[in-house]
Protein backbone atom coordinates (compact mmCIF):
# COMPACT_ATOMS: atom_id res chain seq x y z
CA UNK A 1 0.00 0.00 0.00
CA UNK A 2 1.41 3.39 -0.99
CA UNK A 3 0.40 6.64 0.73
CA UNK A 4 1.08 10.08 -0.75
CA UNK A 5 0.46 12.98 1.65
CA UNK A 6 0.01 16.29 -0.16
CA UNK A 7 -0.83 18.57 2.77
CA UNK A 8 -0.86 18.63 6.54
CA UNK A 9 -1.65 20.89 9.44
CA UNK A 10 1.10 23.52 9.57
CA UNK A 11 2.76 21.76 6.62
CA UNK A 12 3.74 18.87 8.91
CA UNK A 13 2.61 15.26 8.77
CA UNK A 14 3.15 12.53 11.33
CA UNK A 15 1.58 9.14 11.94
CA UNK A 16 1.32 7.81 15.47
CA UNK A 17 -0.86 4.81 14.72
CA UNK A 18 -2.64 3.46 11.66
CA UNK A 19 -5.42 0.88 11.72
CA UNK A 20 -6.77 -1.16 8.80
CA UNK A 21 -10.24 -2.64 8.57
CA UNK A 22 -11.75 -5.06 6.13
CA UNK A 23 -14.74 -3.68 4.29
CA UNK A 24 -17.86 -5.58 5.28
CA UNK A 25 -19.44 -7.06 2.14
CA UNK A 26 -22.51 -8.19 4.07
CA UNK A 27 -25.42 -5.92 3.09
CA UNK A 28 -28.09 -7.91 4.92
CA UNK A 29 -28.63 -5.10 7.42
CA UNK A 30 -29.00 -2.55 4.62
CA UNK A 31 -31.63 -4.71 2.92
CA UNK A 32 -33.47 -5.18 6.21
CA UNK A 33 -33.46 -1.43 6.92
CA UNK A 34 -34.69 -0.60 3.42
CA UNK A 35 -37.67 -2.85 4.03
CA UNK A 36 -38.75 -0.52 6.85
CA UNK A 37 -37.30 2.91 6.00
CA UNK A 38 -37.63 4.90 2.77
CA UNK A 39 -33.84 5.18 2.43
CA UNK A 40 -30.67 4.08 4.18
CA UNK A 41 -30.51 7.22 6.35
CA UNK A 42 -33.50 5.86 8.27
CA UNK A 43 -35.29 9.19 8.57
CA UNK A 44 -38.75 8.12 7.41
CA UNK A 45 -40.71 4.88 7.86
CA UNK A 46 -42.44 3.34 4.87
CA UNK A 47 -46.22 3.51 5.01
CA UNK A 48 -46.44 -0.20 4.33
CA UNK A 49 -43.89 -1.20 7.00
CA UNK A 50 -45.49 -3.56 9.54
CA UNK A 51 -44.91 -3.77 13.27
CA UNK A 52 -43.48 -7.24 12.69
CA UNK A 53 -40.88 -5.86 10.29
CA UNK A 54 -39.98 -3.09 12.74
CA UNK A 55 -39.68 -5.49 15.66
CA UNK A 56 -37.46 -7.77 13.58
CA UNK A 57 -34.86 -5.00 13.25
CA UNK A 58 -31.91 -4.81 15.65
CA UNK A 59 -33.15 -2.99 18.75
CA UNK A 60 -31.26 0.23 18.00
CA UNK A 61 -32.93 0.63 14.62
CA UNK A 62 -36.30 -0.60 15.83
CA UNK A 63 -36.30 2.23 18.38
CA UNK A 64 -35.61 4.77 15.61
CA UNK A 65 -38.51 3.42 13.56
CA UNK A 66 -40.88 3.48 16.54
CA UNK A 67 -39.93 7.07 17.43
CA UNK A 68 -40.46 8.19 13.85
CA UNK A 69 -43.74 6.32 13.43
CA UNK A 70 -45.17 7.62 16.72
CA UNK A 71 -43.83 11.12 16.02
CA UNK A 72 -42.01 11.13 19.38
CA UNK A 73 -38.58 11.95 17.90
CA UNK A 74 -37.77 15.26 19.61
CA UNK A 75 -37.87 18.01 16.98
CA UNK A 76 -34.93 19.92 18.44
CA UNK A 77 -32.76 16.79 18.43
CA UNK A 78 -34.01 15.80 14.99
CA UNK A 79 -32.99 19.17 13.50
CA UNK A 80 -29.34 18.42 14.31
CA UNK A 81 -29.34 14.64 13.99
CA UNK A 82 -30.77 14.75 10.47
CA UNK A 83 -29.06 17.25 8.20
CA UNK A 84 -28.25 17.83 4.55
CA UNK A 85 -24.55 18.69 4.56
CA UNK A 86 -23.34 21.00 1.81
CA UNK A 87 -19.93 20.87 0.10
CA UNK A 88 -17.12 23.28 0.86
CA UNK A 89 -13.96 24.05 -1.05
CA UNK A 90 -10.47 22.66 -0.42
CA UNK A 91 -8.70 25.05 1.96
CA UNK A 92 -5.18 23.95 1.06
CA UNK A 93 -5.76 24.46 -2.65
CA UNK A 94 -7.36 27.87 -2.28
CA UNK A 95 -4.86 29.15 0.27
CA UNK A 96 -2.15 28.60 -2.34
CA UNK A 97 -4.22 30.02 -5.20
CA UNK A 98 -5.32 33.17 -3.35
CA UNK A 99 -2.12 33.54 -1.30
CA UNK A 100 -3.79 33.47 2.11
CA UNK A 101 -3.36 31.46 5.24
CA UNK A 102 -5.64 28.45 5.24
CA UNK A 103 -9.25 29.13 6.10
CA UNK A 104 -11.05 26.54 8.22
CA UNK A 105 -12.29 23.20 6.93
CA UNK A 106 -14.68 22.84 9.88
CA UNK A 107 -17.50 24.44 7.91
CA UNK A 108 -20.08 21.74 8.72
CA UNK A 109 -20.81 21.52 12.46
CA UNK A 110 -23.11 18.70 13.49
CA UNK A 111 -24.10 20.19 16.83
CA UNK A 112 -23.41 16.75 18.35
CA UNK A 113 -20.58 15.92 20.74
CA UNK A 114 -19.17 12.67 22.11
CA UNK A 115 -17.48 11.63 25.32
CA UNK A 116 -14.21 9.70 25.36
CA UNK A 117 -14.84 6.06 24.50
CA UNK A 118 -18.21 6.65 22.83
CA UNK A 119 -19.35 4.76 19.74
CA UNK A 120 -21.76 6.40 17.33
CA UNK A 121 -23.83 5.24 14.38
CA UNK A 122 -23.75 7.49 11.32
CA UNK A 123 -26.19 6.77 8.49
CA UNK A 124 -24.99 8.23 5.21
CA UNK A 125 -27.14 8.74 2.12
CA UNK A 126 -26.05 9.14 -1.49
CA UNK A 127 -22.53 10.64 -1.45
CA UNK A 128 -22.55 11.29 -5.22
CA UNK A 129 -19.09 9.75 -5.33
CA UNK A 130 -17.63 12.33 -2.92
CA UNK A 131 -15.30 11.62 0.01
CA UNK A 132 -16.70 12.41 3.47
CA UNK A 133 -15.45 12.00 7.01
CA UNK A 134 -16.23 13.07 10.57
CA UNK A 135 -13.70 14.84 12.77
CA UNK A 136 -13.87 15.08 16.56
CA UNK A 137 -12.59 18.47 17.73
CA UNK A 138 -11.62 18.60 21.40
CA UNK A 139 -9.12 20.72 23.31
CA UNK A 140 -5.34 21.04 23.35
CA UNK A 141 -2.83 22.45 25.81
CA UNK A 142 -1.01 25.60 24.75
CA UNK A 143 1.53 26.40 27.41
CA UNK A 144 -0.35 26.73 30.69
CA UNK A 145 -3.84 27.09 29.22
CA UNK A 146 -6.24 25.16 27.01
CA UNK A 147 -7.84 26.05 23.71
CA UNK A 148 -9.86 24.40 20.97
CA UNK A 149 -7.69 21.94 19.04
CA UNK A 150 -6.84 22.60 15.40
CA UNK A 151 -7.67 19.03 14.44
CA UNK A 152 -8.79 15.76 15.97
CA UNK A 153 -9.64 12.12 15.39
CA UNK A 154 -11.03 11.61 11.90
CA UNK A 155 -13.25 8.74 10.78
CA UNK A 156 -14.06 8.17 7.12
CA UNK A 157 -17.65 7.60 6.05
CA UNK A 158 -19.27 5.40 3.43
CA UNK A 159 -22.80 5.25 2.14
CA UNK A 160 -24.99 3.26 4.48
CA UNK A 161 -24.42 2.29 8.11
CA UNK A 162 -21.18 3.45 9.76
CA UNK A 163 -20.22 2.57 13.34
CA UNK A 164 -17.46 4.80 14.67
CA UNK A 165 -15.51 4.98 17.91
CA UNK A 166 -13.77 7.99 19.47
CA UNK A 167 -11.17 8.03 22.22
CA UNK A 168 -11.51 11.70 23.15
CA UNK A 169 -14.27 14.12 24.11
CA UNK A 170 -15.16 16.60 21.43
CA UNK A 171 -17.62 18.17 19.01
CA UNK A 172 -18.24 16.37 15.72
CA UNK A 173 -17.75 18.18 12.42
CA UNK A 174 -18.68 16.72 9.03
CA UNK A 175 -15.76 17.04 6.60
CA UNK A 176 -16.97 17.51 3.02
CA UNK A 177 -14.40 19.35 0.92
CA UNK A 178 -14.39 19.11 -2.84
CA UNK A 179 -14.32 21.00 -6.13
CA UNK A 180 -17.45 23.15 -6.01
CA UNK A 181 -17.68 23.19 -9.80
CA UNK A 182 -17.98 19.40 -9.92
CA UNK A 183 -21.52 18.51 -11.03
CA UNK A 184 -21.57 15.94 -8.22
CA UNK A 185 -20.81 18.50 -5.50
CA UNK A 186 -24.29 18.09 -4.04
CA UNK A 187 -25.68 18.04 -0.50
CA UNK A 188 -25.44 14.70 1.32
CA UNK A 189 -28.13 13.59 3.75
CA UNK A 190 -26.74 12.21 7.01
CA UNK A 191 -28.49 10.91 10.12
CA UNK A 192 -26.70 10.54 13.48
CA UNK A 193 -29.53 8.74 15.30
CA UNK A 194 -30.83 8.92 18.83
CA UNK A 195 -28.40 7.40 21.30
CA UNK A 196 -25.34 8.34 19.23
CA UNK A 197 -23.59 11.29 20.82
CA UNK A 198 -25.26 14.18 22.61
CA UNK A 199 -27.03 17.08 20.93
CA UNK A 200 -25.88 20.54 22.00
CA UNK A 201 -26.77 22.39 18.81
CA UNK A 202 -25.42 25.42 16.96
CA UNK A 203 -26.80 28.60 15.38
CA UNK A 204 -26.75 29.09 11.61
CA UNK A 205 -27.53 32.64 10.49
CA UNK A 206 -28.89 31.40 7.15
CA UNK A 207 -31.46 28.97 8.55
CA UNK A 208 -32.06 30.11 12.14
CA UNK A 209 -32.18 33.82 11.21
CA UNK A 210 -33.43 35.45 14.42
CA UNK A 211 -32.09 36.56 17.77
CA UNK A 212 -34.95 34.72 19.47
CA UNK A 213 -33.83 31.45 17.88
CA UNK A 214 -30.24 32.10 18.98
CA UNK A 215 -31.35 32.66 22.56
CA UNK A 216 -33.38 29.44 22.49
CA UNK A 217 -30.51 27.38 21.04
CA UNK A 218 -27.70 28.66 23.26
CA UNK A 219 -29.88 28.23 26.36
CA UNK A 220 -30.52 24.59 25.42
CA UNK A 221 -26.86 23.86 24.62
CA UNK A 222 -24.87 21.74 27.08
CA UNK A 223 -21.35 21.62 25.58
CA UNK A 224 -18.52 23.90 26.74
CA UNK A 225 -18.31 25.66 23.36
CA UNK A 226 -21.12 26.97 21.18
CA UNK A 227 -20.87 27.44 17.42
CA UNK A 228 -22.29 30.33 15.40
CA UNK A 229 -22.08 29.90 11.62
CA UNK A 230 -22.26 33.11 9.64
CA UNK A 231 -21.75 33.65 5.94
CA UNK A 232 -17.97 34.13 6.16
CA UNK A 233 -16.95 33.47 9.77
CA UNK A 234 -17.75 30.91 12.44
CA UNK A 235 -17.55 31.70 16.14
CA UNK A 236 -16.64 28.69 18.28
CA UNK A 237 -16.51 30.32 21.68
CA UNK A 238 -17.06 29.39 25.31
CA UNK A 239 -20.81 29.08 25.72
CA UNK A 240 -20.88 30.87 29.08
CA UNK A 241 -18.77 33.76 27.77
CA UNK A 242 -20.98 34.01 24.69
CA UNK A 243 -24.09 34.21 26.88
CA UNK A 244 -22.49 37.00 28.90
CA UNK A 245 -21.22 38.97 25.90
CA UNK A 246 -24.20 38.34 23.61
CA UNK A 247 -27.25 37.36 25.65
CA UNK A 248 -29.60 38.11 22.75
CA UNK A 249 -28.49 40.18 19.74
CA UNK A 250 -26.29 37.67 17.91
CA UNK A 251 -27.21 39.19 14.53
CA UNK A 252 -25.38 42.38 15.52
CA UNK A 253 -22.23 40.35 16.14
CA UNK A 254 -22.26 37.90 13.25
CA UNK A 255 -23.33 40.46 10.64
CA UNK A 256 -20.58 42.83 11.77
CA UNK A 257 -17.86 40.19 11.44
CA UNK A 258 -19.23 38.83 8.19
CA UNK A 259 -18.98 42.41 6.90
CA UNK A 260 -15.43 42.87 8.19
CA UNK A 261 -14.26 39.74 6.39
CA UNK A 262 -16.24 40.70 3.29
CA UNK A 263 -14.53 44.11 3.22
CA UNK A 264 -11.09 42.52 3.49
CA UNK A 265 -11.93 40.07 0.70
CA UNK A 266 -13.21 43.02 -1.35
CA UNK A 267 -9.74 44.61 -1.28
CA UNK A 268 -8.18 41.34 -2.46
CA UNK A 269 -10.22 41.25 -5.67
CA UNK A 270 -11.49 37.68 -5.36
CA UNK A 271 -15.14 38.19 -6.28
CA UNK A 272 -14.57 36.19 -9.47
CA UNK A 273 -14.09 33.00 -7.43
CA UNK A 274 -15.92 33.62 -4.15
CA UNK A 275 -18.36 32.11 -3.38
CA UNK A 276 -18.74 30.19 -6.65
CA UNK A 277 -15.47 28.26 -6.25
CA UNK A 278 -14.27 28.98 -2.71
CA UNK A 279 -16.67 29.22 0.23
CA UNK A 280 -14.83 28.27 3.43
CA UNK A 281 -15.25 30.22 6.66
CA UNK A 282 -12.74 31.74 9.01
CA UNK A 283 -12.96 29.90 12.32
CA UNK A 284 -12.63 31.97 15.50
CA UNK A 285 -11.90 30.29 18.84
CA UNK A 286 -11.61 31.60 22.41
CA UNK A 287 -8.35 30.38 24.01
CA UNK A 288 -8.08 30.59 27.79
CA UNK A 289 -4.80 32.49 27.53
CA UNK A 290 -2.72 34.70 25.21
CA UNK A 291 -4.52 37.65 23.55
CA UNK A 292 -5.24 37.66 19.80
CA UNK A 293 -3.54 35.74 17.03
CA UNK A 294 -4.02 34.36 13.53
CA UNK A 295 -2.74 31.10 12.08
CA UNK A 296 -3.69 28.53 9.49
CA UNK A 297 -7.19 27.14 10.03
CA UNK A 298 -8.23 29.45 12.90
CA UNK A 299 -7.95 32.79 14.63
CA UNK A 300 -7.91 33.25 18.40
CA UNK A 301 -9.44 35.88 20.68
CA UNK A 302 -8.84 35.30 24.38
CA UNK A 303 -12.09 34.35 26.11
CA UNK A 304 -11.95 37.27 28.55
CA UNK A 305 -12.09 39.80 25.68
CA UNK A 306 -15.18 38.60 23.80
CA UNK A 307 -17.37 41.32 25.29
CA UNK A 308 -15.28 43.96 23.49
CA UNK A 309 -15.28 42.47 20.00
CA UNK A 310 -18.72 40.98 19.41
CA UNK A 311 -21.63 43.40 19.70
CA UNK A 312 -21.52 46.27 17.21
CA UNK A 313 -21.89 49.00 19.85
CA UNK A 314 -19.04 47.55 21.91
CA UNK A 315 -16.76 47.27 18.88
CA UNK A 316 -17.48 50.89 18.00
CA UNK A 317 -16.86 52.06 21.57
CA UNK A 318 -13.06 51.99 21.19
CA UNK A 319 -10.79 52.15 18.16
CA UNK A 320 -8.73 49.14 19.23
CA UNK A 321 -11.80 46.91 19.55
CA UNK A 322 -12.09 46.87 15.77
CA UNK A 323 -8.41 47.34 15.00
CA UNK A 324 -7.10 44.30 16.86
CA UNK A 325 -9.30 41.64 15.23
CA UNK A 326 -9.03 43.34 11.82
CA UNK A 327 -5.23 43.30 12.20
CA UNK A 328 -5.24 39.56 12.97
CA UNK A 329 -7.60 38.74 10.11
CA UNK A 330 -5.35 40.90 7.93
CA UNK A 331 -2.55 38.44 8.66
CA UNK A 332 -4.74 35.79 6.99
CA UNK A 333 -4.96 37.86 3.80
CA UNK A 334 -1.64 39.73 3.47
CA UNK A 335 0.65 37.21 1.79
CA UNK A 336 0.43 38.55 -1.77
CA UNK A 337 1.52 42.07 -0.75
CA UNK A 338 4.03 41.12 1.92
CA UNK A 339 7.76 40.52 2.24
CA UNK A 340 9.92 40.03 5.37
CA UNK A 341 10.38 43.32 7.19
CA UNK A 342 6.79 44.36 6.42
CA UNK A 343 4.81 41.55 8.03
CA UNK A 344 3.42 43.60 10.92
CA UNK A 345 2.40 46.51 8.68
CA UNK A 346 1.19 45.20 5.33
CA UNK A 347 -1.77 43.55 7.08
CA UNK A 348 -2.74 46.97 8.42
CA UNK A 349 -3.92 47.98 4.98
CA UNK A 350 -6.90 45.82 5.92
CA UNK A 351 -7.16 47.26 9.43
CA UNK A 352 -7.27 50.84 8.14
CA UNK A 353 -9.81 49.87 5.51
CA UNK A 354 -12.05 48.40 8.21
CA UNK A 355 -11.83 51.64 10.22
CA UNK A 356 -12.79 53.56 7.07
CA UNK A 357 -15.76 51.28 6.37
CA UNK A 358 -17.00 51.49 9.96
CA UNK A 359 -17.00 55.25 9.56
CA UNK A 360 -16.19 56.43 13.08
CA UNK A 361 -12.43 56.50 13.56
CA UNK A 362 -9.58 57.94 11.51
CA UNK A 363 -6.78 55.78 10.16
CA UNK A 364 -3.72 54.73 12.11
CA UNK A 365 -0.11 55.24 11.11
CA UNK A 366 2.57 57.88 11.53
CA UNK A 367 2.18 61.35 10.05
CA UNK A 368 4.03 62.07 6.83
CA UNK A 369 6.38 64.28 8.85
CA UNK A 370 7.76 61.03 10.31
CA UNK A 371 8.54 59.89 6.78
CA UNK A 372 10.30 63.18 6.03
CA UNK A 373 12.41 62.86 9.19
CA UNK A 374 13.31 59.24 8.44
CA UNK A 375 14.37 59.99 4.88
CA UNK A 376 15.99 63.42 5.07
CA UNK A 377 17.22 63.71 8.65
CA UNK A 378 17.99 60.12 9.63
CA UNK A 379 18.85 59.03 6.05
CA UNK A 380 16.92 55.78 6.46
CA UNK A 381 15.65 53.44 3.76
CA UNK A 382 12.48 51.34 3.80
CA UNK A 383 14.02 48.35 5.56
CA UNK A 384 15.23 50.31 8.64
CA UNK A 385 12.76 53.20 8.61
CA UNK A 386 11.73 54.74 11.92
CA UNK A 387 12.25 53.06 15.27
CA UNK A 388 11.53 49.35 15.53
CA UNK A 389 8.50 48.75 17.76
CA UNK A 390 7.27 45.23 16.98
CA UNK A 391 9.05 42.32 15.34
CA UNK A 392 11.94 44.67 14.45
CA UNK A 393 9.67 46.92 12.39
CA UNK A 394 8.27 50.42 12.87
CA UNK A 395 4.77 49.38 11.98
CA UNK A 396 3.26 52.84 12.39
CA UNK A 397 5.38 54.45 9.71
CA UNK A 398 5.36 51.44 7.37
CA UNK A 399 1.57 51.08 7.40
CA UNK A 400 1.20 54.66 6.15
CA UNK A 401 2.71 53.76 2.76
CA UNK A 402 -0.02 51.33 1.70
CA UNK A 403 -2.71 53.60 3.08
CA UNK A 404 -1.40 56.56 1.07
CA UNK A 405 -1.85 54.47 -2.07
CA UNK A 406 -5.40 53.66 -1.01
CA UNK A 407 -6.17 57.30 -0.24
CA UNK A 408 -4.89 58.50 -3.59
CA UNK A 409 -6.36 55.87 -5.87
CA UNK A 410 -9.52 54.86 -4.02
CA UNK A 411 -10.64 57.78 -1.83
CA UNK A 412 -9.62 60.42 -4.37
CA UNK A 413 -11.06 58.32 -7.16
CA UNK A 414 -8.07 58.16 -9.53
CA UNK A 415 -8.27 54.35 -9.85
CA UNK A 416 -10.83 52.77 -7.57
CA UNK A 417 -9.80 49.20 -8.38
CA UNK A 418 -6.09 49.81 -7.76
CA UNK A 419 -5.66 47.43 -4.82
CA UNK A 420 -7.79 44.72 -6.42
CA UNK A 421 -5.61 44.88 -9.53
CA UNK A 422 -2.41 44.89 -7.48
CA UNK A 423 -3.44 41.81 -5.50
CA UNK A 424 -4.28 39.98 -8.72
CA UNK A 425 -0.97 40.95 -10.33
CA UNK A 426 0.98 39.78 -7.29
CA UNK A 427 -0.88 36.48 -7.24
CA UNK A 428 0.05 35.94 -10.87
CA UNK A 429 3.67 37.14 -10.53
CA UNK A 430 4.61 36.55 -6.92
CA UNK A 431 6.99 38.11 -4.43
CA UNK A 432 9.65 35.57 -3.41
CA UNK A 433 9.71 35.55 0.38
CA UNK A 434 13.35 34.48 0.62
CA UNK A 435 14.52 37.65 -1.17
CA UNK A 436 12.89 40.62 0.60
CA UNK A 437 14.99 43.25 -1.18
CA UNK A 438 13.88 42.04 -4.58
CA UNK A 439 10.38 41.66 -3.14
CA UNK A 440 10.02 45.32 -2.26
CA UNK A 441 11.05 46.37 -5.77
CA UNK A 442 8.74 43.81 -7.35
CA UNK A 443 5.92 45.31 -5.29
CA UNK A 444 6.80 48.79 -6.62
CA UNK A 445 6.82 47.55 -10.22
CA UNK A 446 3.47 45.80 -9.91
CA UNK A 447 1.98 48.85 -8.16
CA UNK A 448 2.97 50.97 -11.17
CA UNK A 449 1.43 48.39 -13.48
CA UNK A 450 -1.80 48.27 -11.46
CA UNK A 451 -2.03 52.06 -11.46
CA UNK A 452 -0.81 52.40 -15.05
CA UNK A 453 1.35 55.22 -13.71
CA UNK A 454 5.06 55.74 -13.09
CA UNK A 455 5.37 55.57 -9.30
CA UNK A 456 9.17 55.90 -9.21
CA UNK A 457 9.15 59.10 -7.16
CA UNK A 458 6.59 57.73 -4.71
CA UNK A 459 8.73 54.69 -3.97
CA UNK A 460 11.90 56.77 -3.96
CA UNK A 461 10.38 58.85 -1.17
CA UNK A 462 9.52 55.69 0.73
CA UNK A 463 13.11 54.46 0.58
CA UNK A 464 12.58 51.58 -1.82
CA UNK A 465 15.32 52.74 -4.18
CA UNK A 466 18.15 52.93 -1.63
CA UNK A 467 20.89 50.27 -1.96
CA UNK A 468 21.02 47.70 0.85
CA UNK A 469 24.09 45.49 1.03
CA UNK A 470 23.35 42.06 2.50
CA UNK A 471 21.90 43.16 5.84
CA UNK A 472 20.46 40.45 8.07
CA UNK A 473 17.02 41.25 9.44
CA UNK A 474 14.92 39.21 11.82
CA UNK A 475 11.14 39.02 11.57
CA UNK A 476 9.52 35.63 12.07
CA UNK A 477 12.83 34.20 10.90
CA UNK A 478 16.16 35.55 9.68
CA UNK A 479 16.48 37.05 6.19
CA UNK A 480 19.23 38.62 4.09
CA UNK A 481 18.19 41.99 2.67
CA UNK A 482 19.83 42.96 -0.62
CA UNK A 483 18.81 45.87 -2.84
CA UNK A 484 21.50 46.20 -5.49
CA UNK A 485 22.02 49.12 -7.89
CA UNK A 486 21.30 46.71 -10.74
CA UNK A 487 17.81 45.72 -9.56
CA UNK A 488 17.07 49.35 -8.62
CA UNK A 489 17.90 50.44 -12.18
CA UNK A 490 15.80 47.62 -13.60
CA UNK A 491 12.81 48.62 -11.43
CA UNK A 492 13.12 52.30 -12.39
CA UNK A 493 13.32 51.35 -16.07
CA UNK A 494 10.22 49.16 -15.74
CA UNK A 495 8.18 51.85 -13.98
CA UNK A 496 9.21 54.51 -16.51
CA UNK A 497 7.15 52.84 -19.24
CA UNK A 498 3.99 54.13 -17.56
CA UNK A 499 2.76 57.76 -17.74
CA UNK A 500 3.39 60.17 -14.89
CA UNK A 501 0.76 60.34 -12.12
CA UNK A 502 -2.02 62.89 -12.47
Describe the role of every protein-language-model region.
Residues 11-16, 118, 130, 170, ...:
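Residues that flank catalytic or metal-binding motifs in active/ligand-binding sites
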Residues 7, 19, 126, 178, ...:
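A mature extracytoplasmic/lumenal domain signature
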Amino acid sequence: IKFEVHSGLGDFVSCDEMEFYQKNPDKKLDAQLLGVFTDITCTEVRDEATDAQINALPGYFANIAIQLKRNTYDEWEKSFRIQDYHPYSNVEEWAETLMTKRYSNLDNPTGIYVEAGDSVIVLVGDTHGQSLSIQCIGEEKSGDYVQTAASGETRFLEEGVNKLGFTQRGMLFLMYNTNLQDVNAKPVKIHIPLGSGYVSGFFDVKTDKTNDKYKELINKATYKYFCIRGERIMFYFHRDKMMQAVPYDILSAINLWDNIISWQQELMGIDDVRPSQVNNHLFAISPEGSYMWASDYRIGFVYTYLNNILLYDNVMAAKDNAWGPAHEIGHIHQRAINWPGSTESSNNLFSNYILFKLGKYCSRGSELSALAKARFVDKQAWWNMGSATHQNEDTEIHMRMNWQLWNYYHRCGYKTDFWQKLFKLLREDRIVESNPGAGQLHFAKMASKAANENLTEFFRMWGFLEPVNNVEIEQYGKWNYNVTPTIIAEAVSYMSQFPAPK
